[in-house]
Regions:
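Short, glycine-/small-residue-rich phosphate/pyrophosphate-handling segment
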Residues: 102-142, 154-159
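His-Asp phosphorelay/catalytic-motif detector in bacterial-type signaling
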Residues: 98-100
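A glycine- and small-aliphatic-rich helix-loop capping segment at beta-alpha/alpha-beta transitions
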Residues: 88-95, 122-127
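N-terminal beta1-alpha1-beta2 submodule of the flavodoxin-like/Rossmannoid cofactor-binding fold
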Residues: 1-93, 147, 151-185
Length: 185
């Protein structure tokens, strides 16, 4: 079977963000899986238009999500919610999300971004995605990712391994199903 194409989306675009460091940590873990082909979409670099107009950035995003077999959203939590740039990304394309699994890597202070993930699960359900049960939560992100080498706790490491297995299972199954019987939604 061909490797799964997995897109990791960095959802925060703020100055001083920790999202890229967290995403790079997850990508390092994910690329250890030989059945995955992992790419990163950094929303800070892509600059999707907020008015959802067609643009070269939107077309690039549409193609990459269309080719993906699974998605991982790396999200911070701002004021008990997820970043606006991430919502713009989800709203910028439509059919490309359908019948694909998604996992979440969240980070923040004491809550670790769990409230952002709770809200995102509702959004992706409306997009006809399958949210895997396991997520990765990075509590006190500046303590764990503030300097190299990163001191990520064992709970997050274990969660990442479980989430990768779940995404692998769903990604392979849904890819075969989409190929044999296109999603009717």
């Amino acid at each position: 079977m061909a490797p799964l194409n997995v897109e990791v989306i960095v959802g925060s675009v703020r100055e001083g963000r920790m999202g890229r460091a967290v995403a790079d940590w997850f990508v390092e873990r994910a690329t250890a899986n030989p059945s995955w082909n992992v790419s990163v979409i950094d929303l800070r670099e892509l600059s999707l238009p907020q008015d959802f107009s067609d643009s070269p950035a939107t077309e690039v995003f549409r193609r990459r999500i269309g080719r993906a077999d699974a998605v991982v959203a790396v999200t911070s939590e701002y004021n008990h919610g997820y970043p606006a740039a991430l919502k713009t990304a989800f709203d910028s394309v439509k059919h490309e999300w359908r019948a694909k699994p998604i996992g979440f890597v969240s980070y923040g202070g004491i809550s670790g971004g769990v409230r952002a993930v709770e809200q995102l699960r509702q959004v992706v359900a409306e997009l006809h995605m399958v949210s895997v049960r396991q997520s990765v939560t990075i509590h006190r992100v500046r303590k764990q990712f503030g300097h190299e080498p990163y001191g990520v706790d064992s709970i997050a490491i274990d969660a990442s391994e479980k989430m990768i297995r779940e995404l692998d299972w769903w990604g392979g199954g849904l890819r075969m199903q989409r190929a044999s019987d296109p999603y009717p939604g």
